[in-house]
Amino acid sequence: MTGMTTDADLRELTVGTGAGGEQLGTDMVLNIGPQHPSTHGVLRLRLVLDGERVVSAEPVVGYMHRGAEKLFEVRDYRQIIVLANRHDWLSAFANELGVVLAVERLLGMEVPERATWLRMALAELNRVLNHLMFLGSYPLEIGAITPMFYAFRERETLQTALEEVSGGRIHYMFNRVGGLKEEVPAGWTGRARAAIGEVRRSLPDLDNLIRRNEIFLARTVGVGVLSAAQAAAYGASGPVARASGLDLDLRRDEPYLAYDQLDVPVVTRTAGDCHSRFEVLLDQVYVSLDLAEQCLDRVDRLTGPINTRLPKVLKAPEGHTYAWTENPLGINGYYLVSRGEKTPWRLKLRTASYANVQALATLLPGCLVPDLVAILGSMFFVVGDIDK
């Protein structure tokens, strides 16, 4: 050894930087997911961090893509209902409903009035079940365990009612083109009304536990603020958009089924932060319980069939139509194109979760890493609904 420095000694070699290597040396690139306990499915977030502050965020979707839209093209109009309720497993009844509404619109079919009101009652109960899941899981994600038990207690009460009428706990498959699968069991509306009353009496336990909890407020108030302009730009809808001040609800503004015969209160907030999104979801539960009860009252006063007799092979006429519904997580759209065959030529889904999750690219930059999961959970999405 001579102690002399050669050109070879001065050469620098960077090994294994992978994706995002250009930021190494100043910022850190961090991947959240695709497997992560705070997501309903497999979502990946590619983050660039400066210390504990997020500089940029990119939601990477597609890990749960199962080709639902392509599968629709090789299933007849009865079989697609089986697929329709699986991309958002927390809103199964609402997803079935959107598909059959599109088919019925293309067929020019009038659905029996009793079936219409039963659909509305079941859709509102399904909305409550969806919201209760997030009302329990969201506090859990930021460290509050107890609300989960209260939320699941109320879910089980309503889940029993829906299981009795449809036979399914998650995938109901109760909608049919032209109505519903079958008549509800004798006395079911009374039992469903009793379940609604029980949930309404018990819900304040969850409400009082978490809404004004000091620690919960500290973690959510002023965190992850999404302005009304940003929500509109991303096409956000549902509780996420209404928490930012977008007063939009299809049940009131573009009514389908018989929602035009109901007074539908629309729950909104203006702060656009995590706490506002949680409050909108919580207050919507009270509204949906009231709406479901009104629908059941109407069902009890109606007689007549629950569905429409269909031909053995159902073919929609050539043409196209678009139906949209106010799903629990936001606006879902169904664009149906038919060539006069027994299967759809194309059925395009517009899902609320896909639009809402895009806002993370705006929400996350500037936040601290500890707030990241609080913001992520408050967007209330299902990854199957994103990836389809």
UniProtKB/Swiss-Prot annotation:
Pfam families on file: Complex1_49kDa
Enzyme's top EC category: translocase
Entry annotated with the keyword Cell membrane: yes
Main location: membrane
HAMAP family: NDH1_NuoD
Assembly information from the UniProt record: NDH-1 is composed of 14 different subunits. Subunits NuoB, C, D, E, F, and G constitute the peripheral sector of the complex.
Single Gene Ontology MF annotation: NAD binding
Function: NDH-1 shuttles electrons from NADH, via FMN and iron-sulfur (Fe-S) centers, to quinones in the respiratory chain. The immediate electron acceptor for the enzyme in this species is believed to be a menaquinone. Couples the redox reaction to proton translocation (for every two electrons transferred, four hydrogen ions are translocated across the cytoplasmic membrane), and thus conserves the redox energy in a proton gradient.
PANTHER family: NADH DEHYDROGENASE [UBIQUINONE] IRON-SULFUR PROTEIN 2, MITOCHONDRIAL (PTHR11993:SF10), NADH-UBIQUINONE OXIDOREDUCTASE 49 KDA SUBUNIT (PTHR11993)
PROSITE patterns: COMPLEX1_49K
Protein's recorded name: NADH-quinone oxidoreductase subunit D 2
EC number assigned by the record: 7.1.1.-
GN (gene name): nuoD2
Alphabetically ordered keywords of this record: Cell membrane, Membrane, NAD, Quinone, Translocase, Transport
Membrane topology: Peripheral membrane protein
Similarity section: Belongs to the complex I 49 kDa subunit family.
Catalytic activity as recorded in UniProt: a quinone + NADH + 5 H(+)(in) = a quinol + NAD(+) + 4 H(+)(out)
A GO-annotated cellular component: plasma membrane
Cell location: Cell membrane
